[in-house]
Amino acid sequence: MASLAPFFKISDSILADESFDDLEINNHFKCTSKDLNEYPRTSTPLPGEITSIYSLPRSYNNQNLCTRSKPTTFISQNQQKGMTEKPKHSEYFLRLMKTRQEMQKKLTAKNGSNKSVQQYLRKLPPSTSKEVTIIPVKMKPDDNSVYISKELSDRTDTKLPKVSTKEVEKFGEQSDDEERHERSHIASDFNQKTPQSTHATSNHRKRIFIGRTGAKQQHVSKKATESELPYNIDVSTSNTTNATEALKLLKRPLLLPSKDPRSSKMPRLDLNQHQFRCKQYIVHSQFTCTQIEKTFKCRVGTSTESEDLDDYYFDAMPDGKAPHFPQQPVARQNDDGSLELECFVDANPTPQVKWYYDNKEVENSGRFSANLANKGSDSYSAILTIKELADADAGAYRCAIVNPHGKGNANFNLKLTGFSSPTFVEKPQISSRDDGQVMVMEFRAKSILEPTFVWQKLVGGGAEEIIANSDRIKAVKKLEAGNVYYSALEIKEPTKDKDAGQFICTVKNESGKLTATFTVKFEVPEGAPSFTRKPQILQQTSAGGEPAICFDIGYSARMNPQVTWISPKSKKMKESSRIKFKTNDEGNGNFTAQLELTNYKAKDSGTYTCNIKNDAGEANVELTLNIEGPLDDYADDSEN
């Protein structure tokens, strides 16, 4: 304001003089008045607050009111209006004030405001302005390890309490212009003084290995679709590791700028950042670290002078290894239908493992069980087992592994897009009941989706579908507990001619099928009746000279076999004038059985059965007679 006083005193002459050209940015202007030569010419705006744009017109009018009796050249009304209306349209604003305000904004953004910074720093002792910035760390080529130079020194303070690493938070980076503006803003509110701390430093330097930082990520897609297992599973897996090399703060900083509401965290030493944040403060400048046994002392200040530095103590992390996934996670199904999610990890010390399903922790229960197994050295295997897998088990699973050196996550995305083909719970087998009168082919299969059962018999190299639920054959299907189905084929009075061979049952659902195969063999016990040749129907003449039909059967048997003939009406036949039975012993256990039918008529047509039985077993053979002609009445020769 003092430097602008001459300008206001002669403002009347400046505006009235015809030789007045313009005002320049750097306060240089052309005028014929000699008094103006006393106005200081500067290359930059002077410090201090810029006068209001209304000051010049107001001073000008007041001066004219006081000297109205003197001959004075007044400015016109339009000219006065141009200086007194809104600032952005006034001539004074456009010529001088607007230009100076633009310059002031640029300088404020670069160096801070004149009022807040320059005046405040005149009163503030230099030692009370403390700033900290972490030195960028250089990385070696093709190496994930981080190295930093540190000074060795002796620790002079006593044991200090530790602070948990959970209070650590990274703040980020700022450009140079943003840092200058941030320092100016913070310094405006800093109003406390703290004495400096003393320290001792050694000149010996040593290069110290800190550890591994950074993150690795792997993605793999795996699909398990085994036809013999009860599920088709689509599993997407990924690994993420984040190993943080941090130094835990032991002593709270003493000299720090105040009032930054963005964080209430304690400081953390992160080797890859230029700033760190600590409890309501942001600090950034330069620092040096000194190793004292297993503790690091950080010297912080605005200059390299030792008297301007403050000491902060950080506890070095113990030796060990952050969690690392050496291979891809695995998802597999067991024969019992359970699902296992397994991830492999290298860590030291032993990590803590937690499993999450849709971001909710999975607790050990009847269906879920978690296990961590040591595979030797620092290798571990974390397994989550899911029993009785159901539709509701699909979703996102996460294995969270953490130890003091870092943490890692293995992600599983389980999709049950469809269930696999049925599986055997009980293998196929053949049994009998009702004293061998019923043959049963049965098995049990498990299927989540309801299956269909189709029974077939191989005939002549092909497959013939069996008609179920007939008088002699019956198919059985029954649902039991746990999605288990029982299926059986029951055959009454099975015979070698009809029922020997291979039977197939196909179990099918929307995802696949299962085939059960049965082989039926009829084994004749020693001495049991068996047929030695193909039965024959012969046309001949009886002993009385009458036309006759003879059913001739050859068989072998021991232990006095008995022969029984069954008529087409399923009745036991007896001898009569028209029916004669003959049995001839041919030796070596071979026999011939004959049924002679004389005076045969059309009504004698039908299927006749010869049953041969002894203590070792029995055998049956059927013969079909077809006689053409009128159906005359004849006597019934069967037993009542």
UniProtKB/Swiss-Prot annotation:
Q: How is it modified after translation?
A: The initiator methionine of isoform b is removed.
Q: Where is the composition biased (Basic and acidic residues)?
A: 154-186
Q: Which residues form the signal peptide?
A: none
Q: Where is this region: Disordered?
A: 154-204
Q: Does the keyword tRNA processing apply?
A: no
Q: Which SMART domains match?
A: IG, IGc2
- Which InterPro entries does its entry note? Ig-like_dom, Ig-like_dom_sf, Ig-like_fold, Ig_I-set, Ig_sub, Ig_sub2
Tissue expression summary: Expressed throughout development from the 1.5 stage of embryogenesis in bodywall muscles.
Q: Which SUPFAM superfamilies match?
A: Immunoglobulin (SSF48726)
The protein's superkingdom reads Eukaryota
Which Gene Ontology BP terms does the record give? cell adhesion
Tell me where it resides.
Answer: Cytoplasm
Question: Its principal location?
Answer: cytoplasm
Which key words are in the record? Cytoplasm, Disulfide bond, Immunoglobulin domain, Repeat
Do the record's keywords include Repeat?
yes
PROSITE patterns for the chain = IG_LIKE
Biased-composition ranges for Polar residues? Answer: 189-201
Cysteine pairings via disulfide bonds: C343-C399
Q: Give the Ig-like C2-type domain ranges.
A: 323-417, 422-521, 529-626
One GO term describing the cellular component = cytoplasm
The job of this chain, per UniProt, is described as:
Stabilizes the attachment of the myofilament lattice to the muscle cell membrane. Isoform b is sufficient for wild-type function.
Q: Could you tell me what this protein is called?
A: Disorganized muscle protein 1
Q: State the organism of origin.
A: Caenorhabditis elegans
Lineage of the native species? Eukaryota, Metazoa, Ecdysozoa, Nematoda, Chromadorea
Gene name per UniProt: dim-1
